From Swiss-Prot:
Region entry Disordered, spans: 47-67, 127-152, 738-831
Chain positions found as Phosphoserine: 481
Regions of compositional bias (Basic and acidic residues) in chain numbering: 738-751
Protein's UniProt name: Synaptonemal complex protein ZIP1
Other comment: Present with 391 molecules/cell in log phase SD medium.
Subcellular compartments: Nucleus; Chromosome
Alphabetically ordered keywords of this record: Chromosome, Coiled coil, Meiosis, Nucleus, Phosphoprotein
Function: Required for meiotic chromosome synapsis and cell cycle progression. May act as a molecular zipper to bring homologous chromosomes in close apposition. ZIP1 may encode the transverse filaments of the synaptonemal complex.
Stretches assigned to coiled coil: 177-333, 397-438, 456-752
Biased composition annotated in UniProt, kind: Polar residues: 752-780
Amino acid sequence: MSNFFRDSSMGFKPRPNIFAKLRVRDVDSDSSANTVVENSSNCLDVGSSIEGDDTFKKPHKTSTEQELITSMSLSQRNHGYSDDMEIGSPKKTTSTDQYNRILKNDVAAIENDTDEDFEITEVREVSEGVAKETKESHGDPNDSETTLKDSKMHEYTMTNGKAPLHTSINNSSTSSNDVLLEAFTNTQRICSNLKQELQKQQQDNAKLKVRLQSYASNSDKINEKVGKYKSCLETLQERIATLTSHKNNQETKLKDLRQNHQLYQRRISGFKTSIENLNKTINDLGKNKKEADAELMKKGKEIEYLKRELDDCSGQLSEEKIKNSSLIQEMGKNREEMIKSIENFFSEDKAHHLLQFNKFEERVHDLFEKKLQKHFDVAKDTLNVGLRNTTVELSSNTETMLKQQYEDIKENLEQKMSSSKDEMAKTINELSVTQKGLIMGVQEELLTSSGNIQTALVSEMNNTRQELLDDASQTAKNYASLENLVKAYKAEIVQSNEYEERIKHLESERSTLSSQKNQIISSLGTKEAQYEDLVKKLEAKNIEISQISGKEQSLTEKNENLSNELKKVQDQLEKLNNLNITTKSNYENKISSQNEIVKALVSENDTLKQRIQQLVEIKENEQKDHTTKLEAFQKNNEQLQKLNVEVVQLKAHELELEEQNRHLKNCLEKKETGVEESLSDVKTLKQQVIVLKSEKQDITAEKLELQDNLESLEEVTKNLQQKVQSQKRELEQKIKELEEIKNHKRNEPSKKGTQNFTKPSDSPKKNATTSNLFPNNSAAIHSPMKKCPKVDHISKSRINSSKETSKFNDEFDLSSSSNDDLELTNPSPIQIKPVRGKIKKGSNCMKPPISSRKKLLLVEDEDQSLKISKKRRRK
């Protein structure tokens, strides 16, 4: 459109100057300016009233401050707490309702004025469309962007549609130049509004990017915290598993200890019974030992008596041997004498002498036989009687006594040894392997001692046998000498057969006697050997009894040691039972406390999972909202209340975290009681304390960040208030300057109007509301005509100030319509209805010249200031 109006190739008919008509309409524009000023003052009053109803009850917080809070706080939780915000902020809703009512009243008053002036049905249809948009915005907040666009299109059609209506009514007075100029101004305003919307949307995009970044950082922090909590839960689960395994191991150990204790008690009872039996057997053995000692004393006395008798018999035998030797010597002497006498006799008278010699020899032989027979008979009788008596007595007494004693002792010892062996075997098997070794050593010693005894007995038997053989050899030698003598005598007495027969008979008797003697000697040797065996056996038994007594003493000592060990083991078992009870109670307390901790952590984990799900849902919703919020303006105002509620909830969450910290501190104090018993538990608890401290530091850091953000917001609000005041002052100064400029421009309206009409200027974003308040009146065209060189400087300063304010007001210049439920927002420049001035039919319209084909865009601030200055001047 602008190129169309600026095209110099297209020719137009010469028109009258339109600025003359604008001068005529100054009176009508003053009244409209008054209404605009009153509306702006009402809006300021409403803004001050809204500032008074702040949720945090702070005097310096405005709508801009709360919107900065929305940009700095967490925007991802908006959807989760929308219902709570609507319930928990009745003051805000009441203040916004009052503000919306005032706006609706102002808009209704303006619409009533326009309806009374023009009576156009299309304007009423536009108001109904706006009412429908308000209903739809209350019903569905997600469709607010489409309703805003529709309302903008209605306003644009309304502003664009009223010009041809005015022209149709005032065809007689107006011209096509007015219509074109009005359409041009409308297109210019539309362009400025579109630029403002583009800037706002760019700012919203920047805000949303910042919020997405903050949301991503917060989600990363939450994921880290969730990971920490998961690691804590895993460590706790591992610790619980180790504790349960340790508990099971201790229970198994306790069971084993109990079983071992019962086994030891049974063994101890068995040892006691075996020891009692051993004591009884030892007492019986002592009694039997005393009896055996008495019997052995008696037997020793009897053996000594028999030894004396044997000595007497041996003395008698030696005497007989001496007598035999003396007889043999006498017989030799007699033989020599007889030989001499016989030789003498034979030499004298051989025959006579031979007869006498034979007779004498017979007599001698008879005498010799008689004497020898007597001696042999006497010796034989004495020997036989003595030997028989001694042998019978010895054999009878010794055999009977020794057999009886031996059998009795043997039976007793066998019984006792069998019983003692059985008992000792049982005790030895039950006690230990060392006792078995001792018993085996004792048995080996007994075997060695018995072997030694047997060897000693064999040696003594051999000695006695050798002595008896020596005696027998001596007697045999004596008998051999006798045989030699007899043989010599036989040789000498060969002639006599009687002597030979007698000699044979004597030899037979001698052989029988020698055999009897040998039998007696052998029987004596056997009896002596038996006697010596019995003596040695008695000595061995005495040795065994002494060994048994030593063993008895050792067993008694072992019994005492075992009883002492039993007492010690019982004391240890009592200590172990006490320790078991204490450890059981401690572990039960620990397990109960850890179960409580686990429950608390599980509940926290569940809450965190729910929170994560909520955050995921919020993330999805935010991603959806990011696509829809590029053109939305009302939800940003709704986020104020939600984020305020979230701040309260964050404070409540901080209190909950403090309570959790207190609970964890109490749990740690409970756990510190068991530090001496389990050092590993202390380490894990210290790690948990460190983790909790780190979380607390994170929470305190977040608190400090929130406090810093609040302080920065307060500073920003103060700066904004100061800037608003400075802007008001600048506006007042500009109004004064514009009044002076108007006074100065009245003298030169035509020259400066043509110069300024060719200079287009872009309307700033901050003054969009004032441009919409003033309609397409002809009085608005005076502003470029009455401009002086100071106006450029003022417009530049105004643009710079608007840029500075736009830096701080990026997040706060949000549009608001009559259907907004939120408070603390600036009124939207699009939703406010423009006020049209009354167009008179009889007004003289000045047509522009042909040379002014390029039209100048109006500056809205200058237009408004000029109208206000005109109105004041006319008053």
